[in-house]
C-alpha cells in the first residue's frame, strides 16, 4: 500500500513537471486555449493574455509573480467568461496583476476559484456586464488579502460575491472594492482591512453569528450604497464610514421600538447609532457630528438582499469629517486593459531552408484584427523576393525637359527605417561611426525616379537633412538577389544608378522643393542614403556624385565611395571590403603656418594600427547660383477708375505682371445689358387752383410715345396717377402741395418699381412715404375698354388703369374737418359731368431739365361728410383709393396744376399720367328720379 502511494506521488510530481507552463515573456492567445494538467507560473516582467476563451479551467496551481500579469478577457458580446480553478489541492498566489474582464459580454459570467489556499498580495479584478446575474466566489479554505480585490459590474443584479469557505474565516488586511455589486458575508471576517461600497453596492452581513472583527471597516462612498445586517440576539458593533447623503444602514427586519427605546437612537457623544426591532438590535459606529433630526427610517429594496420595509435608516445631510483608516485609503482602481484586446500590427521574420539547402530569411507583416462579429483573425503578408524592374528617370533643367532615359535598376525593399535628423556634417559622421551593424539584412532604400528644378521658389528658410542609413555585414548577405525593387512616386530630386554603371554621374539642383537622392549598387554591404526633408532656399546647391573604385588585388570585391556636397561641407563614406585593410572617411584639423586652424576631410586607410591618408577632399568652391528667371504672367482683373467729373467707374481686362510691375494689356468693353439700370429721379410738384373748366396737358417738351396718347382733354378732373413707363425699372417721386405759396399738405414721397412678365403684362410696386410712414402697394397696369353713359349718351374709350392689390388710403379734407378713408374706401366725388379716363405716355428728354406746364382743370369738388356740401376754395388732395380685391383704381383728387417737373438724372425716362373722372351728385339724383318714376308707374298700374 505504501508502495502504491509512493508511485502515485511520483506520477503526480512527474505530471506537474511535464505539463508545467512557465511564462517568461509577453504572450497573447486568442480563441480556445487548453491548459491541461498544468501548473502555471508567470515570471516578473512577463504577461499572459488569453482573449475570447469561453471556458478557462485551471487544474494546477496558479502563481503570478511580482511584476507579472495574467489577463483573461472577452471582446465578444455573445461570449461571457467562465473561469474556474477546481484543483482543491492546489493554491492561488498573486503578487502581480490578475484581471478577469467580461464587461462587454451580454450574457452571464462566472468566476469560481477554489483551492487549498488563496493569497493576494497584488491586484485582482473581477468584472462582468451585469446585464444578467453573475456570480463570483473565492472559496479557498485559507483566505488572505493584503492589497486590492476589485469586484465590478456595469449595473447591479441579483448576483453576489462570496469570499472564503462558508462557515470558515477570511483575513482581510487590504481593500475589497465593490462597484454595483453585493457582498454577502458567509464567514468570519478577521483583520483590519476595509470593504468599500461604490455606486449601487451593498455590504450584506448575513450571519452575525460569525463574528466580524471590531477592527474591520466598512466604507459607504455614494448615496446609492448601503449596509444591511442580520438581526439576531447577538449584538455586534460595526465601524461604518461615509454614512450620509442619503445612503442607508439597516437590519433584515423592520425597525420597531419597545416600551423603553425607540426604533433607532444616536448617541452624539460616542457616535454610536443603534437600530432595533423590539428586543433585537445592532450597533454601528458612524462617528460624531450628526444631527439627530436628519435621520429617517426608509426601505432598502436593492437587488440581491432581503427587501425589508422600513428596515433601514438614512441620514439626509452631509457626512461629518472623519479620518479614514489606512486600509480604506487604498484606491479602488479601474479595470486594467488586457494586452492584445485591440487590433494590432507587427513585423515578423522567418528563417527557413529552401530546396537547394540554402537558409532563406523572409520577413512580413502580421495583422491581428476582428471581424464584424467580434471574432479575431490573423493575416500575415510576407515580403516577396528580389526582382528587377525597369524605372524611368527624367531629368529636368530649369523649365525645360532635357532628356529621358530608361535604365534597369536593382533596389531593395524597405523593411526597416533608421531615420536620423541632423543639420551638420559632424552629427552625421558621429552617427555613422557609432552605429553597430545588425546581423539581420534589414534594409531601407527609397527609389528615386527623377530630378526636377523649379524656378518659382522665392522663399528662404532653414533646412535639415533627413538621413536614412542602413548597414549590413557581408556575412548576412552577399548579393541583393533576395529583395524586391521598391519604386516610390512623386520624388522631386533623385539620381538613378544603372546596375552595370562604372562611370561617374553628377546632378546639380537648386531650390529643391523635396529632394530625396538615394542610390543602390548590388553586391555591396554598405549602403548610404541621404535626403533633404525640408524644402531648401534658392541659394543652396546640392551636388551628388557617385564613383565606383577598385581596391588592390587583395580586396574581395569593389568598394563604393559616395560623397555629398552642400555648400562648403562634404560628407564621404567608404566600405570595408577586406578583413586586412580598412578604409574610412575621417575629418581632422590642421594648423597653418599663419596659426589658422583648417578642417580637412579625406579617406583614411587603416591596416592594423597604421593609418594612411589616401585622399584629401578639396574644399568645395563657391557655388554661383544663377538668378531666378522673371516669369511674366497674365490674368484677368477688375479695377475702379475715377473720371474727370469725380465719378467712379468699374473696368475689367487682362493684366500682365512681371515681378512687381503690372501692365494693362486689354480692357474689356462694357457688356450690353438687357436690363435698364435703376435710378432715382426726384420731382417737385407745385399745384394751384385754376378756374378753367377744362384740363389741358401739353406734351410739347416730351417725346410722344403713343399717337393716341399724346394729348387729352377732360372736364372736371378728379384724379391723376403718375406711373413709370415700362422702359424704367424704378423711379422715386416726391411732392409738396402749395396753396397760396404756403405748404398745404405733408410731403409725399413715392418709390415705384415696374416689372415686365413673360406674358407681356406689366406690374408696378409703389411705396409711399407720408411723414416718414411707409405705405407699400403693388399695382398692375391694365388696358381696358370702358363704356361711359350719361343719361342717353354713351361713349367708349380705351383706358389704361393702375390697379392696386392692397393699399391704405388717406384723404386730407378741408381746414374745418379732415376726412379719413380707412379700409380702401373713399368718399364719392361730386361733379357736373362724367367723362372718360385716358392715359398720356411721355418720355422725358435726355437733355437738361424740362418742365411740364399749363396743366389746368376744373375746380375739384369733394363731398364733406358733415355738411354734404362742395368745397372749391380749399385745397384737397387724396391718394388713390382701391376697394379690397378690386383690380381697377377708384378716382381721387390731385393738384390741378402740375409744374416744374424736373428730373435730376439725365437718363431717359417716361411717365404715364392717367386721370379719371368720378361719378357726380347729379348722376345720383338722376337715378333717384328714375326710381321714383318707375315706382309711380307701378303704383298707377
Swiss-Prot record:
> Mind listing the UniProt keywords for this protein, alphabetically?
Cell wall, Glycoprotein, GPI-anchor, Lipoprotein, Membrane, Secreted, Signal, Virulence
Q: Which Pfam families match?
A: Hyphal_reg_CWP, Hyr1
Q: Which positions carry the propeptide annotation?
A: 918-941
- According to the record, the signal peptide region is 1-20
UniProt-listed InterPro entries: Cell_wall_rpt, Hyphal-reg_cell_wall_N
Question: Which Gene Ontology terms of cellular component type are present?
Answer: cell surface; extracellular region; fungal-type cell wall; side of membrane
Q: Which domain of life is it from?
A: Eukaryota
User: What kind of modification does the protein receive after translation?
Assistant: The GPI-anchor is attached to the protein in the endoplasmic reticulum and serves to target the protein to the cell surface. There, the glucosamine-inositol phospholipid moiety is cleaved off and the GPI-modified mannoprotein is covalently attached via its lipidless GPI glycan remnant to the 1,6-beta-glucan of the outer cell wall layer.
Lipid group attachment sites (GPI-anchor amidated asparagine): 917
Glycan attachment residues as annotated in the record? 36, 367, 686, 732, 790, 818, 825, 884, 917
Q: How does it sit in the membrane?
A: Lipid-anchor; GPI-anchor
Localization of this protein: Secreted, Cell wall; Membrane
- Residue ranges the record marks as coiled coil: none
Q: What does this protein do?
A: GPI-anchored cell wall protein involved in cell wall organization, hyphal growth, as well as in host-fungal interaction and virulence.
User: Which family does this protein fall into?
Assistant: Belongs to the HYR1/IFF family.
The name this protein carries in UniProt is: Cell wall protein IFF3
Its encoding gene is what?
A: IFF3
